[in-house]
Curated annotation (Swiss-Prot):
Gene name per UniProt: mdh
GO biological process, alphabetically ordered: malate metabolic process; tricarboxylic acid cycle
Annotated positions binding NAD(+): 1-2, 23, 83, 106-108, 216
Reaction it catalyzes: (S)-malate + NAD(+) = oxaloacetate + NADH + H(+)
Residues at which substrate binds: 70, 76, 108, 142
Keyword Oxidoreductase: yes
Source organism phylogeny: Bacteria, Pseudomonadati, Pseudomonadota, Gammaproteobacteria, Enterobacterales
UniProt similarity note: Belongs to the LDH/MDH superfamily. MDH type 1 family.
UniProt-listed InterPro entries: L-lactate/malate_DH, Lactate/malate_DH_C, Lactate/malate_DH_N, Lactate_DH/Glyco_Ohase_4_C, Malate_DH_AS, Malate_DH_type1, NAD(P)-bd_dom_sf
Pfam families in the cross-refs: Ldh_1_C (PF02866), Ldh_1_N (PF00056)
GO MF entries: L-malate dehydrogenase (NAD+) activity
Function: Catalyzes the reversible oxidation of malate to oxaloacetate.
Entry annotation: catalytic residues: 166 (proton acceptor)
Name used for this protein in its record: Malate dehydrogenase
Length: 283
């Protein structure tokens, strides 16, 4: 995900932004040199090795995509043992180096890595629930694509709110809330299932060659850029993400968020659900 995400950010971040790449792999500074030849006004540096500190200094937004990817036959929870440790270590460094940064966790299983990050930040005394996000944007862009295909719309005209979590049946697209589009109950059930299983569709199609890295890079870039716009004072920036809420549905829950200068400005209502959606939420 990292390289695709870095390429998109190098091209799309506002002029004057600084982009830092970090990975344990020694290739990372070279990836930054490669990207630095792209003519945009975004400064880029790459860091590798055991110490992430220089990459984090002064950061306003940190996106964590480090970890192992899914292989066929695995679900997102199979990644837990390895990826939990990676996220824990990185977040400990964030707590020390840039405790006020907004942190977006991409590393699966998001439903648990976000909770781990929250505990690490709490232990360090720097947790702000308005600044920690599980990036679920891939579920939204997939929903937009699949709905547009099914209904003959332009994908750019469709925006589907997706609530719940970021794995399997916890992913709940609110298909009933798309203006000007309606679904039969069967269509809604089939489409919901396809959105929930879209990650597996990619894992199987890649036949052992990894998971969704390019579409995830696009999703993470969209979320990161929305955060940057909101931090810079743009109004009415809304994205769905997996955050600690008021505990109405679960401690952590993906819902529409109004973003602002301090991260989450407002956790927006999930609105009125169809009977099918309500049943899925209650389950």
């Amino acid at each position: 995900i990292g390289q695709a995400l870095a390429l998109l950010l190098k091209n799309q971040l506002p002029s004057g932004s600084e982009l830092s790449l970090y990975d344990i792999a020694p290739v990372t500074p070279g990836v930054a040199v490669d990207l630095s030849h792209i003519p945009t006004a975004v400064k880029i540096k790459g860091f590798s090795g055991e110490d992430v500190t220089p990459a984090l200094e002064g950061a306003d937004v940190v996106l964590i995509s480090a970890g192992v990817a899914r292989k066929p036959g695995m679900d997102r929870s199979d990644l837990f043992n390895v990826n939990a440790g990676i996220v824990k270590n990185l977040v400990q460094q964030i707590a020390k180096t840039c405790p006020k940064a907004c942190v977006g966790i991409i590393t699966n299983p998001v439903n648990t890595t976000v909770a781990i990050a929250a505990e690490v930040l709490k232990k360090a005394g720097v947790y702000d629930k308005n600044k920690l996000f599980g990036v679920t944007t891939l579920d939204i862009i997939r929903s937009n694509t699949f709905v547009a295909e099914l209904k003959g719309k332009l994908p750019t005209e469709v925006e589907v709110p997706v609530i719940g979590g970021h794995s399997g049946v916890t992913i709940l697209p609110l298909l009933s809330q798309i203006p000007g589009v309606s679904f039969t109950e069967q269509e809604a059930a089939e489409l919901t299932k396809r959105i929930q299983n879209a990650g597996t569709e990619v894992v199987e199609a890649k036949a052992g060659g990894g998971s969704a890295t390019l579409s995830m890079g696009q999703a993470a870039a969209r979320f990161g850029l929305s955060l940057v716009r909101a931090l810079q004072g743009e109004k009415d920036v809304v994205e769905c993400a997996y955050v600690e809420g008021d505990g109405q549905y679960a401690r952590f829950f993906s819902q529409p968020l109004l973003l602002g200068k301090n991260g989450v400005e407002e956790r927006k209502s999930i609105g009125t659900l169809s009977a099918f959606e309500q049943h899925s939420l209650d389950a």
